[in-house]
Amino acid sequence: MMFKPADKIQDLQFFGEFGGVNPSISDSSTYTFLSAKSMFDTFEGNTDGCYLYSRHSSPSNLYLSAALAQMENTEAANVTASGMGAITAVLMQLCKKGDHIITSRTIYGGTYAFLKNFLPEYGMGVDFVDITNLDKIKSLIKPNTKVIYLETVSNPLLEVADVAAISEIGKTNNIKVVVDNTFSPLSVTPANLGADVVIHSLTKYINGSSDTVGGVICGTADFINDLKNVNNGACMLFGSTMDSMRSASILKNMRTLHLRMKQHSANALYLAKAFNEIGIKTVYPGLESHPSHEIYKSMYNNEYGFGGMLTIDVGTLEKANAVMELMQERNVGYLAVSLGFYKTLFSAPGTSTSSEIPADEQLEMGLSNGLIRFSIGLDNDIERTFELIKSCLKDLNVI
């Protein structure tokens, strides 16, 4: 039976304290007990439904965590204060000094910096690889390899990982496969493809209004409980705790995620095809020319399409900057990082979201100075948007 993540979200039923249709927001950092013994039992983990301190958990955070676990079809989830809060906690929970990680050569700049610069200082080895090359992944496996870390669709080059095949490699070698699914919520369900842990930056599509920073870790109940353990849990001890007000806001926005993802994807596919037709070098997983188009099709929940991210290459950084500035001036969208907003966002990743990656490594992986990354918005008239963008390209002699 086909998995329908939007149905899982629709079927959530949380009541407010006084019968409200939205669950009540717990606006407290600490909680009272009727007896000292109840407090002791709660600290020991022997009671259900009791709260101690909001760094441990709060009702609002548990509501959102439950919703995200349903969406990703995992046993449990835990929300964090940012996407990086989720990524760092997972890797530090799974790995220790002397362990080894295999990861994609093209990943979000903050993740790259953590893996490249931070973890080696704590005695962990990291190898970066073309994540689409399964033989290369296998060749890098060592006896101490504990994690294969990847993004479903890589940032910013939009390389598509074969999550099912990589998960099989992980299981064969007793290696945990961790997937950042930020670019493809609803569209791809990594846990159904064998991934052990699924991460999102909630800041992006899931929240969708660029007014909140947050993250989530989805996995087995045992793993989530380990992360929240008061003695050695990375989420508990690192303290990347989401505010209850923000949890409540994101939970409400999740109710429209299925509508938004369909529109983001439809608009992006239209623009990708239109850019192709006028001779602009375009990368989008929904184009048949994308080297991993068929792999994406084999993984996706097709009603949500191929996502809202695409790139074009205009040749040089100077041209890229000029195009973006003119697009902002003509109200195509905003010259800004991040993604998943209702307006189109665009940036030159080599000097922004991937600037942590050294220039020589950017060149080696194919991240050119002229690359513009688009997060396509919810525009009602995407043909009008294309004409605006085309006018910018024409006026700057890009086409």
Task: Annotate each PLM feature.
Residues 235, 327-339, 391-399:
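A common structural junction motif
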Residues 116, 125, 139, 146, ...:
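PLP-dependent enzyme catalytic core of the Aspartate aminotransferase-like
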Residues 6-14, 76-283, 297:
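Conserved PLP-enzyme active-site core in the AAT-like
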Residues 269-343, 357-363:
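Conserved small-domain helix->loop->beta segment predominantly found in fold-type I
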Residues 40-47, 325-327, 389-391:
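Short Gly/aromatic-enriched secondary-structure transition segments
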Residues 250-259, 307-315, 373-377:
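Short, well-ordered beta-strand elements within core beta-sheets of diverse protein domains
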Residues 1-58, 66, 372:
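N-terminal "arm"/small-domain region of PLP-dependent enzymes with the aminotransferase-like
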Residues 35-85, 110-117:
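Conserved N-terminal alpha-helix of the aminotransferase class I/II PLP-enzyme fold
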